[in-house]
């Protein structure tokens, strides 16, 4: 029995760390979350998501978040003559931990996508214990036009990579900020240094191809300075 309790305790602690990181990620992207949601204690996590025998229940680990006013402003295209009141390119996000511990196939992904689409979620993040099958990944690609779906492994969320002392602060630029940057330095976007969309930081921020991120570093000699990268 002790061995079983110890296994449950380790799994619960791992899931709690992933739960905290995914909340920090969603908050850092600009969604509204209460401080107590982001900084939930391990005891509160156990009370909310563990069964009577101490085992964690991934099926209860889910939440949604709405974009903040600043996020809506950043993701709203500038008005044009043909579209004087453009809609923002963001909306409510749905996050869910997949209860399946085996292979994540088409049926699991279709169910998740249908839930997001039916409930009008603009984006969805599925956190899984194991990697997706190639067929499940194809479902994500097909649905990207109307619901942006992302997947993260639990093990990749045990530590928030942006909290590492060697990782500089990354800030997504709005369309207007990107255009102003290119105009100021008389550059084409293809002349900017690049960051791959599969880069861990790009995935953390949910960067899309064509977006520009500002990287703020501090140097003992140069002080605080910024560089820019285009997501490709």
Which residues make up each language-model segment?
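Short, surface-exposed secondary-structure boundary micro-motifs
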Residues: 217-218
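Helix-rich terminal scaffold detector
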Residues: 1-122, 134-142, 155-161, 167, ...
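Long beta-strand-rich cores associated with HINT superfamily self-processing modules
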Residues: 160, 168-173, 177, 181, ...
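Short, compositionally biased
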Residues: 223-232
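Short, structured beta-strand/loop micro-motifs enriched in basic residues and often containing a Trp
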Residues: 188-199
């Amino acid at each position: 029995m002790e061995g079983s309790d110890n296994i449950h305790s380790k799994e619960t602690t791992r899931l709690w760390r992933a739960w905290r990181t995914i909340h920090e990620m969603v908050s850092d992207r600009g969604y509204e979350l209460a401080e107590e949601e982001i900084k939930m204690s391990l005891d509160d996590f156990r009370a909310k998501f563990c069964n009577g025998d101490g085992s964690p229940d991934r099926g209860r680990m889910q939440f949604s978040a709405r974009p903040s006013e600043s996020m809506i402003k950043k993701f709203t295209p500038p008005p044009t003559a043909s579209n004087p009141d453009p809609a923002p390119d963001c909306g409510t996000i749905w996050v869910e931990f997949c209860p399946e511990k085996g292979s994540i196939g088409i049926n699991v992904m279709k169910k998740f996508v249908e839930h997001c689409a039916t409930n009008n979620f603009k984006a969805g993040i599925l956190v899984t214990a194991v990697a997706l099958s190639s067929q499940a990944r194809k479902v994500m690609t097909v649905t990207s036009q109307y619901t942006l779906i992302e997947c993260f492994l639990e093990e990749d969320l045990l530590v928030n990579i942006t909290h590492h002392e060697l990782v500089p602060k990354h800030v997504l630029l709005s369309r207007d900020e990107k255009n102003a940057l290119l105009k100021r330095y008389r550059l084409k976007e293809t002349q900017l240094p690049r960051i791959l969309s599969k880069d861990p930081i790009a995935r953390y921020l949910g960067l899309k191809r064509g977006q520009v991120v500002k990287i703020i570093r501090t140097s003992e000699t140069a002080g605080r300075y910024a560089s820019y990268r285009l997501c490709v």
